[in-house]
């Protein structure tokens, strides 16, 4: 296996081990997290996946992809929980990390890609967004990968 592939799998394994196992360890810690999860819960309960509503009354103000992601993952896991609500953000972070590593490795070198990927993984605000049930990481994934 080439050095680039070894480095990629190292970053992939480390990023996954740092992010995924701890998603459901804490309860929702802000007003925003349960607000997003409630919309996904309402989607599952009502079966209305077109117009996301908050407990059947208020129309959600954010783009629906986060709600769709939470609802789809929660349907697989058997219900909306802290883990299933935060998993879309974590998956978006991992996808962004992999694309970021590939981009830097392609245009610089593997050593620089490993260092910058580790810096991204340990960045406080990026890590916070990766383990929270918020739209931020999905938006960051799509805007950074579009460039």
Which positions does each model-derived feature cover?
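Membrane-integral, polyisoprenol-dependent glycosyltransferases
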Residues: 2-144
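Active-site Asp-x-Gly
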Residues: 147
């Amino acid at each position: 296996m080439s050095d680039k592939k070894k480095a990629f799998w190292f970053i992939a394994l480390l990023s996954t081990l740092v992010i995924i196992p701890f998603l459901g360890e804490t309860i929702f810690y802000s007003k925003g997290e349960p607000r997003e999860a409630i919309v996904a819960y309402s989607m599952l309960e009502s079966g209305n996946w077109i117009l996301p509503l908050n407990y059947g009354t208020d129309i959600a103000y954010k783009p629906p992809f986060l709600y769709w992601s939470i609802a789809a993952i929660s349907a697989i896991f058997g219900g909306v929980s802290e883990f299933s609500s935060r998993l879309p953000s974590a998956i978006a972070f991992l996808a962004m990390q992999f694309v970021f590593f590939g981009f830097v490795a392609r245009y610089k070198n593997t050593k620089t890609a490993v260092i910058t990927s580790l810096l991204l993984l340990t960045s406080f605000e990026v890590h916070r967004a990766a383990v929270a049930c918020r739209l931020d990481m999905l938006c960051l994934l799509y805007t950074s990968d579009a460039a």
